[in-house]
Amino acid sequence: FGCYRLLPRGLLREPLAGLSRADTIILTRTDRVSRETRHEIHQACRRQTAPRELPWLETIHRPRELRAADGTIRPLTDLIGRSLFGFAGIGNPAPFQSLLEDQQADLVGFTSFADHHPYSADDVAMLSRQARAVGAELAVTTLKDLVKLPRDGLAGIPLVALVIGIEFTTNPAALEQQLAALQPGKSSP
């Protein structure tokens, strides 16, 4: 909710006034902020959308599985007890790093790149050196980054993406009702 901007947050995003077009409000990553902060955000949104009472939903990001560059799916349990080297070229890599730290593994190194980073051969060589230097058994990145990298990993260190899903922690039925109303032949609630 940085700078009172939406989708997701930041200076170049939807202004708070954009809530006037909303039918539902979904607050993401609620496990990363306090209950008080969530309440403040909820109240700010309610003021913006008054007198309408919009459904309010909260979500968390939850790791689902691992995906290799060749599309192979591996269970999250493959991380347990292993030494991981993580990296990401996304706008805010800290939550991704936190998700890796939350796994039952040892995150032995992490490197951040700028958002939308175009990985070069030199970058791959640097990542390979860093991962080997810290004794990583597995390199883990985002799906967004995985597609920009060689399919064979980092110089012998297997490379996977942590697949992250959204889990609704409050009122998922409200979203289901909103989506059902969009189906042909259905009317809005």
Model-predicted segments: where are they?
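Short, charged, surface-exposed secondary-structure boundary motifs
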Residues: F1-G10, R67-A69, P118-A121, F168-Q177
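Short, conserved loop/helix-junction motifs that constitute active-site signature segments
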Residues: L16-R21, Q48-P51, D78-I80, V134, ...
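Phosphate/Mg2+-binding loops and adjacent switch elements
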Residues: F1-R52, W56
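Short, flexible loop segments at boundaries between secondary-structure elements
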Residues: R62-R64, A114-P118, G156-K186
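Short, charged/polar "capping" segments at the starts of alpha-helices
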Residues: R32-I41, R67, A94-P95, L146-P150
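A C-terminal functional module that forms or caps the active site or interfaces directly
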Residues: P93-L154, V160
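Redox- and metal-dependent alpha/beta enzyme cores, enriched for Fe-S-associated oxidoreductases
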Residues: T72-I73, T77-A121, E176, A180-A181, ...
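Beta-strand-loop-alpha "switch" segments that mediate conformational coupling across diverse proteins
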Residues: W56-R67
